[in-house]
């Protein structure tokens, strides 16, 4: 069978399963759940590896000066948090169970090899990830659960007198379609 053998209204391009090029400097670590009949346990931070199993987490945080840890909850339907970026700080995001979110990243660094690239990450809902977002990468998220919790580390203490937070419109042409939830 060929595309021409399909009724014209249903002739569309084949779904593209290619993975986009990730934004330079964004790091993602899948966390391990230790599950038994009582529930589960999961490490989300480790400053050093005391055993082989702790090496990936300790390596992920190597060189990270965690200055502040924050917790945020969105309990509004159909809401988008973002976009914003920082000049001085990196963020490390974690959506704790049962929260789930669609993270949108947009590289706006002038000299980055991935300048202008976008990346989408779905985190939470059983896909336990840490996502490290470097300074200069605009970021935001769309909750996929209500409520949706975000636990995150930052590398600079927040100063209300001199906030290191700059806005990019959530519906900027480079990202406006990335917030959608695809059907089909």
In which residue ranges do the predicted regions lie?
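Non-catalytic, conserved peripheral segments adjacent to functional cores
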Residues: 1-126, 146-184
């Amino acid at each position: 069978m060929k595309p021409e053998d399909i009724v014209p209204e249903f002739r569309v391009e084949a779904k593209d399963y290619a993975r986009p090029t990730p934004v330079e400097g964004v790091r993602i670590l899948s966390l391990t759940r230790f599950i038994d009949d009582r529930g589960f346990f999961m490490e989300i931070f480790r400053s050093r590896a005391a055993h082989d199993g702790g090496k990936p987490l300790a390596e992920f945080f190597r060189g990270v000066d965690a200055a502040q840890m924050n917790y945020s909850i969105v309990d509004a339907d159909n809401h988008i948090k973002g976009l914003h970026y920082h000049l001085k700080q990196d963020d490390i995001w974690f959506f704790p169970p049962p929260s789930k979110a669609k993270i949108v990243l947009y590289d706006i660094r002038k000299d980055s090899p991935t300048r202008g690239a976008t990346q989408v990450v779905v985190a939470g809902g059983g896909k336990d990830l840490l996502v490290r977002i470097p300074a200069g990468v605009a970021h935001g998220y769309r909750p996929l659960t209500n409520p949706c919790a975000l636990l995150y580390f930052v590398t600079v203490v927040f100063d209300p007198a001199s906030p290191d937070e700059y806005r990019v419109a959530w519906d900027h042409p480079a990202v406006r379609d990335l917030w959608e939830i695809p059907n089909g």
